[in-house]
Amino acid sequence: MEDDSLYLRGEWQFNHFSKLTSSRPDAAFAEIQRTSLPEKSPLSCETRVDLCDDLAPVARQLAPREKLPLSSRRPAAVGAGLQNMGNTCYVNASLQCLTYTPPLANYMLSREHSQTCHRHKGCMLCTMQAHITRALHNPGHVIQPSQALAAGFHRGKQEDAHEFLMFTVDAMKKACLPGHKQVDHHSKDTTLIHQIFGGYWRSQIKCLHCHGISDTFDPYLDIALDIQAAQSVQQALEQLVKPEELNGENAYHCGVCLQRAPASKTLTLHTSAKVLILVLKRFSDVTGNKIAKNVQYPECLDMQPYMSQPNTGPLVYVLYAVLVHAGWSCHNGHYFSYVKAQEGQWYKMDDAEVTASSITSVLSQQAYVLFYIQKSEWERHSESVSRGREPRALGAEDTDRRATQGELKRDHPCLQAPELDEHLVERATQESTLDHWKFLQEQNKTKPEFNVRKVEGTLPPDVLVIHQSKYKCGMKNHHPEQQSSLLNLSSSTPTHQESMNTGTLASLRGRARRSKGKNKHSKRALLVCQ
């Protein structure tokens, strides 16, 4: 009865899963018996699941759920490309996937953490906030990631992108604990990062002799999938949650009947993450060789069949980022990523190059890491963008617009004049790609004007301006005397002042002809001195 009372009070024990790169619980899990009730106990399995929804009592809630940003602060359009500093493609690809993670980006753009953080230099959250803000607010540009992002990880050679990804996520999680170093493991799992990326595994062992049940819960930040025998992500997930028989040498030592007996072990997801990171195990742990096979993955993924409660309705996730490795080994090759901007358009992020893509191209890659977000979360962020972004400080929008326009002018001297209308700048920065933005500029640029009649008032009285017909053949056929007169006049020697005026007008006429070379209806001007 002692076990029963512990169970009813919800006092469960957990094993802290410290190695983030290996997310599947296995035999290394300590088997913690939370109950010794047989199968026919009044407390059924379903009842036990409902009772432990909160998993464990939390001494301190480090990031209350209500503090998560509820609406989007992200610009609708795609942001900046990232400069490769030398074998840093794995850094760039990982950072782009994190930058376009809606809950994380919204929190970073709210600047909530930096306003209360007292150790900005060594804080990964502050460093990521600065990076994400720069990347999203500089569309069409290429920025250089801060060296602090890979400090302690990058050693001048290419590393594994997934390892760097989880190194960054773990560092952000630790940055949530500067003033809470003495908190228990359960409270550490209430950080903002765990609320975004984290969930709990449930490893259940059922004794086939006495029907006693032992449950182990462990937190996760990503899920590793074995693809050796899987042709799709769904097949890999099915293999992950497939019951395993424990018998013979692997028989289970039951804590209820105190015997070694056959048992059934089942691994399921007990709580779901807002953002799901699925890692396809493409590289051998020994040789590093790559499993270069196509594994299908869907745009929408229902995770409900793999949960502890499989019959509670669909739990749909939508794809928003894909990290790809091109090459034959984890020691070489190239990393790039595909991300879905807030506007819904897919983009290929290949270091400094940012190009529009399609969902067909995205789903045809040999993916290494897949990023999914709960459909309800994505729709909520998308709806907030369609309604308009949150109010900002007075004048902040105009300041950002002028800054963006000034940067574009410095980078592109040909765009220095004239300035665009405000509504065109707004549309370009929020809804258009860089190419579309340049197209709009060219369409709305004021064309150079040259009207010879405006010059006539400045000419000396002894200079005559004659407008030749655009139909040369007409003058030649019907007015030969005018053609001859023009030739004679043009061959005469002008005075010094006339020569200066003639040269000036000829130069102006040349520029006008070049600027209007595509206008078939423009008239030619011929200067004749009397």
Swiss-Prot record:
Subcellular location: Nucleus, Nucleolus; Endoplasmic reticulum
Catalytic residues of the enzyme: C89, H334
Assigned keywords, A-Z: Apoptosis, Endoplasmic reticulum, Hydrolase, Nucleus, Protease, Thiol protease, Ubl conjugation pathway
Keyword Aminoacyl-tRNA synthetase included in the entry's annotation: no
Positions of the UniProt region annotated as Disordered: 382-412, 477-530
Ranges of compositional bias, category Polar residues: 493-505
Compositionally biased spans, kind Basic and acidic residues: 382-392, 398-412
Top enzyme category: hydrolase
One GO CC annotation: endoplasmic reticulum
MF (Gene Ontology): cysteine-type deubiquitinase activity; hyaluronic acid binding; RNA binding
Catalytic reactions of this protein: Thiol-dependent hydrolysis of ester, thioester, amide, peptide and isopeptide bonds formed by the C-terminal Gly of ubiquitin (a 76-residue protein attached to proteins as an intracellular targeting signal)
USP domain mapped to chain residues: 80-375
Gene Ontology BP terms: apoptotic process; positive regulation of epithelial cell apoptotic process; protein deubiquitination involved in ubiquitin-dependent protein catabolic process; regulation of apoptotic process; regulation of protein stability
Pfam families per the UniProt record, alphabetical: HABP4_PAI-RBP1, UCH
Annotated tissue distribution: Expressed in heart, brain, liver and skeletal muscle.
UniProt feature, compositional bias: Basic residues: 510-524
Entry similarity comment: Belongs to the peptidase C19 family. USP17 subfamily.
Function: Deubiquitinating enzyme that removes conjugated ubiquitin from specific proteins to regulate different cellular processes that may include cell proliferation, progression through the cell cycle, apoptosis, cell migration, and the cellular response to viral infection.
Entries under PANTHER family matching the protein: INACTIVE UBIQUITIN CARBOXYL-TERMINAL HYDROLASE 17-LIKE PROTEIN 4-RELATED (PTHR24006:SF651), UBIQUITIN CARBOXYL-TERMINAL HYDROLASE (PTHR24006)
The name this protein goes by in its record: Ubiquitin carboxyl-terminal hydrolase 17-like protein 24
Provenance organism: Homo sapiens
Gene name in the database record: USP17L24
